[in-house]
Curated annotation (Swiss-Prot):
This is 2,3-bisphosphoglycerate-dependent phosphoglycerate mutase. PANTHER family: PHOSPHOGLYCERATE MUTASE (PTHR11931). The lineage of its organism: Bacteria, Bacillati, Bacillota, Bacilli, Bacillales. GO terms for molecular function: phosphoglycerate mutase activity. It comes from Bacillus thuringiensis (strain Al Hakam). Pfam families: His_Phos_1. Pathway: Carbohydrate degradation; glycolysis; pyruvate from D-glyceraldehyde 3-phosphate: step 3/5.
Amino acid sequence: MIKLVLIRHGQSLWNLENRFTGWTDVDLSENGLSEAREAGAILKKNGYTFDVAYTSVLKRAIRTLWIVLHEMNLSWVPVHKSWKLNERHYGALQGLNKDETAKKYGEEQVHIWRRSIDVRPPALTEDDPRYEMNDPRYKELKKGEFPLTECLVDTEKRVLNYWHSEIAPSLKSGEKVIISSHGNTIRSLVKYLDNLSSDGVVSLNIPTSIPLVYELDDDLRPIRHYYLSMDGEVPEGEFPKHIVF
């Protein structure tokens, strides 16, 4: 049996401020650092180990992974970073407070932008200071490939491209894999693995820094999945509560 561990990064500074983050490279909050340490302790206590790790090129996911591996005495594990595991690009909404945006555009419109799978938020323009095309971490991207906004379908497409080309082969070769990424990135993977409908993924919430374990067969089809806590598996439909760590 193959086990895959997915983990959303710990609480970020903009999660704390209730702002749209997307590709903006914000760090973890103090609470997020604590959540990451807790996740590492949970995995260590439950006897997990890893051969390889995957993450995005955004520091909140990278730092979460570093902390998790450090807590597990696995800092030596190879880490592969890719923009294809970045959070969904929220376009011109990036940096805006979610409540203030809802007051400006209406709660229904903002809900559509956030939760529908095929509606993109307003796009950035290339002269916007939030446009990251010249950032060296994206040097492999050509101008027409760099997103100015994304819907969940766009995010899912790049995430699954990376899944099939890099992650799935690692799992099939017998490597123990952890992925530290973002809410919509993990939603995309869960949608694919569990063959969720569009309605199913709309209501799917991924908590910060709680290890989500998938048990897979040899063809990477899910047998079952569950969240982990210090006490082991968490009953389906429940999230473990964070502790002060």
